Amino acid sequence: MMSQRYFKLLVVFLGLFAMIASIAEGKGRHKNGGGSRKKTNTVNNGGNNGGKPKVPMCGTTAATCSKGSPSCKGGKPTCGSKGAFNACGGNVKVTC
């Protein structure tokens, strides 16, 4: 009888711990993850990918520039500081 009481207390404690842990992660008990902030699109991120800018690609690797940093503006790959893309190698084109 005494062990059942402790078992019930243990179950309640573990349940509370799980709820607190999920709230601390920002998940809560909601279908959408429970976070109070919605992810929003930022400029030049090519969709809702957590706010990270979309990077031009040479096949499966990130493209590099001779000057400046690579980015995708309006769906087209560009280099900052009037730079040019370094050669991808072969017939591979730079894509966004």
UniProtKB/Swiss-Prot annotation:
Keywords tagged on the record: Host nucleus, Secreted, Signal, Virulence
Signal peptide: 1-26
Induction or repression: Expressed during host infection.
Top-level lineage group: Eukaryota
Amino acid composition bias (Low complexity), ranges on this chain: 41-51
Biased composition (Basic residues): 28-40
GO cellular component: extracellular region; host cell nucleolus
Subcellular location: Secreted; Host nucleus; Host nucleus, Host nucleolus
Cysteines joined through disulfide linkages: none
Region span, Nucleolar localization signal: 29-36
Domain-level remarks: The nucleolar localization signal (residues 29 to 38) is required for host nucleolar accumulation but not for the nuclear localization, nor for the augmented plant susceptibility to pathogens.
Role played: Rust effector delivered into infected tissues to modulate host functions and contribute to pathogen virulence. Binds the TGA1a-binding DNA sequence to repress the expression of genes involved in immune responses such as the defense-related transcription factors WRKY18, WRKY27, WRKY33, MYB51, the defense-related proteins NHL3, RPP8, YLS9, AZI1, CRK11 and the jasmonate pathway and regulation genes JAZ1, ASA1, ASB1.
Protein name: Candidate secreted effector protein MPL124478
